[in-house]
C-alpha cells in the first residue's frame, strides 16, 4: 500500500520526502527542502528539522519545543505559493501557506510565511522566515480547494 507524501507533491512518500528524512538524499532545491521540512513536522521527525536548520541558528536548543509542538499540532496541508532566487545561487526564498489544527483550541489555522534558505557546500538549509506584508493573504482563491486537504473550498474551511 502506498502513502502519498504529506508535502502535497502527489508523489509517493517513499519516492518524495522519505529519503530526505532518512538522510539518504539531500534536497537539491530550496523548495524540496521546504517540502521535506513540512513532511518532517507531519512525521514528527525532530532530528531532520534540527539538522536542516542553518548551523548558525543552533536549532538543537529548540528540540524540546519542536517535540512538544508535535503533540498539539496536526498538520493538514501545504501550499507552495512561489519560489524565487535570492541575491545569488546560494540563496532562495519559498513562500507558502500551511493549514494545521491546534489541538488545544480545536481551531484550524493557516500559517503564511516567506522562508529564506541558504546553500552551503551543496546543502540547502532553512535560515529564517517572515510573515509577508500585513494585509496580503496567500494567493488562494476563495473557491479554490483548501490547502489543508479537507476537500472543501478555502472559504468554507481555513479561509
UniProtKB/Swiss-Prot annotation:
Annotated Pfam families: SEC-C (PF02810), YchJ_M-like (PF17775)
Superkingdom per UniProt: Bacteria
HAMAP family membership: UPF0225
Family of the protein in this entry: Belongs to the UPF0225 family.
Protein name, as recorded: UPF0225 protein plu2503
Amino acid at each position: 500500500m502506498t502513502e502519498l507524501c504529506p508535502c502535497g507533491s502527489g508523489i509517493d512518500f517513499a519516492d518524495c520526502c522519505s529519503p530526505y528524512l532518512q538522510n539518504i538524499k539531500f534536497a537539491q532545491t530550496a523548495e524540496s527542502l521546504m517540502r521535506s521540512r513540512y513532511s518532517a513536522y507531519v512525521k514528527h521527525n525532530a532530528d531532520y528539522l534540527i539538522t536542516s536548520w542553518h548551523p548558525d541558528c543552533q536549532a538543537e536548543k529548540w528540540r524540546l519545543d519542536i517535540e512538544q509542538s508535535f503533540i498539539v499540532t496536526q498538520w493538514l496541508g501545504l501550499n507552495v505559493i512561489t519560489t524565487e532566487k535570492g541575491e545569488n545561487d546560494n540563496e532562495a526564498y519559498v513562500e507558502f501557506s500551511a493549514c494545521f489544527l491546534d489541538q488545544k483550541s480545536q481551531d484550524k489555522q493557516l500559517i503564511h510565511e516567506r522562508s529564506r534558505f541558504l546553500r552551503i557546500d551543496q546543502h540547502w538549509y532553512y535560515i529564517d522566515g517572515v510573515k509577508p506584508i500585513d494585509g496580503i493573504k496567500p494567493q488562494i482563491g476563495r473557491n479554490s480547494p483548501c490547502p489543508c486537504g479537507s476537500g472543501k473550498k478555502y472559504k468554507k474551511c481555513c479561509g
